[in-house]
Amino acid sequence: SYMHGNYGYFWNRTNVYNNMEVDHVELKDTFADTSEDVMGYLSDELLYRQAVEKLSNYDAPFISYIVAASSHTGFTLDGLQDRSKVSIDVGKYKDTFFGNYLESANYADYAFGIFIDELKKADLYDDTVIILYGDHNGLDMYNNEMIEFLSELDGNVTDVDIKLNYIRVLAGMRIPGISNLRIDKPVSKLDIKPTLAYLCNLDSGVSLGTNMLAKKNFICLNNERIV
C-alpha cells in the first residue's frame, strides 16, 4: 500500500500508484479523520494512527510505504490542536526558520513514537521490518541560524562541515532479531533494498544500489562535490 496525508491530485499520486498496480492507495480523502491539518497534510500523528488501523486489516505479509510530511519544508505547525506535543525549547531561535525546523523535527519524533506504540498495540510490531528515512535535506545549506548553532556546538565550522551537514539525511532500519548495527559511511537510498535483502537472507535481484555492509571502497559524488 501507499499512504500519504495529502490529496491524490498533488503530483498526480492517485494515477501514478494505481498505474503501478498498488493494491491500496490511501490518500487524504480516504482517511476518516482529517481534523488536524499541518501545511495542507494530515498531521503525522493523525496519519500514523489511521495508517496502523488500515494495516491491521491487511492480509500478511504486506509492504506499506507511508509518507509523513509534518516536518517538510515550511516547518509550520500552526495546525496542531495541542502544541504541548512539541516538547523542545529552541530558546533564542524561537520563531526563526531554524527554530521552526527544530520544532518540526521534534514533533516528527513524537509522532513516530506514536506510530511505534500503535504497531505494538495492534500486535504488528514484533513481526515488522521498519525502515525510516528522509527524502531530502531540510534547511538551506547556508541558513544563518543553523551555522550559528553549529558554531556554538563545535566552535569552528568550516565550509566542508556546512556541506556535509546539508547532505546528511536521516535513515534507519529496525529488523526483528538484529540489534546494535551502525553504518558510518556515505550511503544512498538505492542501497536500502540490497542491504535489507542481505540482512533478511533474501535475493535482492537486479539493483542499482549496493549492500551497505559490503567492504567496498567508492567515491560519493554529490552535486559535483566529492565527499
Regions found by a protein language model. Give the residues of each.
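Solvent-exposed soluble domains appended to multi-pass membrane proteins
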Residues: 1-227
